[in-house]
UniProtKB/Swiss-Prot annotation:
Gene from which this protein is expressed: ykfC
Chain sites annotated for binding Mg(2+): D166, D284, D285
Similarity-based family: Belongs to the bacterial reverse transcriptase family.
The protein's name: Protein YkfC
Pfam families noted in UniProt: RVT_1
Top-level taxonomic group: Bacteria
InterPro entries: DNA/RNA_pol_sf, GrpII_Intron_Splice-Mob/Def, RT_dom
């Protein structure tokens, strides 16, 4: 079996029929060639030397890889496979806080990679074009470029506000049953769905204590980024239908044009101008760019909170979900974007790295150079 051809078939089937539900996925991911490729990718990653709770690292697994893959295959097909809890570690963030990571056992990472290889082609056609996080051939730079393009058509006199979306502890608050419901829209294989349920319910070990997973997907899991995108795709599609689709834009143009021309219905019913909205998301970070009044922007922020908290059971941090004007600048994905007047008198959008982030980078670079000076070699990892 040629894996890339099978992935292309999955992508084609999904793109051709948006309502298609794929069957027999478990049989696919347990093919020896499929598991072998998943193992190759897993063991070639930088994190392969880091063991999970079972203490098995890359060297130990490679010594008996063929046997271990056969055991995995038998367990998956028989339904006896049970993932181990992830090993919880904490890494420092730039603001001084700690970010929790869950490190699965290597054998579980292989299974998650096999699942990802099958699921990713199916969902790529479903995901919104303005979603950039954890997707093939997309990056932070693509997202920043998109936002800059969305801002370049604005003149100095046009209102342009930005909603800086901030989800509270997103990866830790994903609702399991809502996630499974979203996955079932594309997968009808009951055995595969059982495997996915076991994976998100595996829990983690923190300071020697087991903690069950009632909600959330672990940061550090191979399949977690895809699952997070599947969940937030519901939000993307809501915004698309409400503000971003061709129909929504056409309706807005007709509405505003009626007001401008003073048509009787618009005058009689005292219609208000509808705001224009642009959108970009990278994982759990998103921005909405609104051409309208401050009151309209605040109403849209409240609408977003209603969708996220009501339909998806996620929490929008209202204290951090700010509404700055583009002339005052805003932060997105570690970049500060601001609209300025150039020396030629034109308004343009400039992106810079905030001073605090630049200082942190300079400090880490200085520490790295000091290590080189002391040891004579760059210490990786």
């Amino acid at each position: 079996m040629i894996i890339s051809e099978m992935q292309r078939k999955l992508a084609t089937w999904a793109a051709t029929d948006p309502s298609l539900r794929i069957q027999r996925l478990l049989r696919l991911i347990t093919q020896p060639e499929w598991l072998a490729e998943a193992a190759r990718i897993t063991l070639s990653s930088k994190g392969a030397h880091t063991p999970g709770v079972d203490g098995v690292n890359k060297t130990m697994l490679q010594a008996r890889l063929a046997v271990e893959l056969q055991i995995l295959r038998d367990e998956l097909l028989s339904g006896h496979y049970q993932p181990l809890p992830a090993r919880r570690v904490y890494i420092p963030k730039s603001n001084g806080k700690l970010r929790p990571l869950g490190i699965p056992a290597l054998r579980d990472r292989i299974v998650q990679r096999a699942m990802l290889m099958a699921m990713e082609p199916i969902w790529e056609s479903d995901f919104h074009t303005l979603s950039y996080g954890f997707r093939p051939e997309r990056s932070v730079h693509h997202a920043i470029r998109t936002v800059k393009l969305q801002l370049t058509d604005c003149g100095e006199t046009r209102g342009r506000w930005v909603i800086e979306g901030d989800l509270s502890s997103y990866f830790d608050t994903v609702h399991h049953r809502l996630l499974m419901k979203a996955v079932r829209r594309r997968i009808s294989d009951a055995r595969f769905m059982t495997l996915l349920w076991k994976t998100i319910k595996a829990g983690h070990i923190d300071v020697g204590l087991f903690r069950a997973a009632s909600e959330g997907v672990p940061q550090g899991g191979v399949i977690s980024p895809l699952l997070s995108n599947i969940m937030l795709n519901e939000f993307d599609q809501y915004l698309h239908e409400r503000y971003l689709s061709g129909k929504a834009r056409k309706d807005r143009w007709y509405w505003n044009n009626s007001i401008q021309r003073g048509r009787s219905t618009a005058v009689r019913e005292n219609w208000q101008w509808k705001p224009a909205v642009a959108y970009c998301r990278y994982a759990d970070d998103f921005v909405l760019i609104v051409k309208g009044t401050k009151a309209q922007v605040e109403a849209i922020r409240e609408e977003c909170r209603g969708v996220l908290e009501g339909s998806l059971k996620l929490r929008l941090n209202m204290d951090k979900t700010k509404i700055p004007h583009v002339n005052d600048g805003f932060i997105f994905l570690g970049h500060r974007l601001i609209r300025k007047r150039s020396r030629y008198g034109e308004m343009r959008v400039v992106s810079t790295i905030p001073q605090e982030k630049a200082r942190n980078f300079a400090a880490s670079l200085t520490a790295l150079l000091w290590k080189v000076r002391i040891s004579g070699e760059i210490l990786l990892g």
